[in-house]
Regions:
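Conserved alpha/beta cores of soluble small-molecule-handling proteins
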Residues: 1-104
């Protein structure tokens, strides 16, 4: 990722959503995108559609990432993970990480 310096780095002005992924599917994706849209509007970061963030983009990112990484446990099941979408005035970033939280 080529990071552009903006107010996020100087003042923490940005928004993010971390979305649980189970069996390769993002949980409550539409709700997360609505919440990110609300935050972007409030912080004047631009509309998600204008920034290239929508349901299809997230699903394509997940599909591509999972095809490039072996994210299965020893028994062959998909490990729990999370996709994080970060949005600042000049940057959009998608990243993946383990999800240590259990349904319990």
């Amino acid at each position: 990722m080529n990071v552009k310096m903006d107010d996020c780095f100087q003042f923490g002005l940005g928004a993010f959503e971390t979305i649980s992924v189970a069996d390769g599917r993002p949980i409550f994706l539409d709700r997360h995108l609505r919440r990110l849209e609300d935050a972007a509007r409030f912080l004047d970061l631009g509309m998600l559609a204008e920034r290239g963030i929508d349901r299809i983009t997230v699903l394509e990112y997940l599909r591509k990432w999972m095809s490039e990484h072996d994210y299965r446990d020893r028994s062959g099941h998909m490990r729990r993970c999370a996709v994080k979408i970060m949005l600042t005035q000049k940057n959009v970033d998608f990243s993946m990480r383990d999800n240590p939280y259990t349904p319990d």
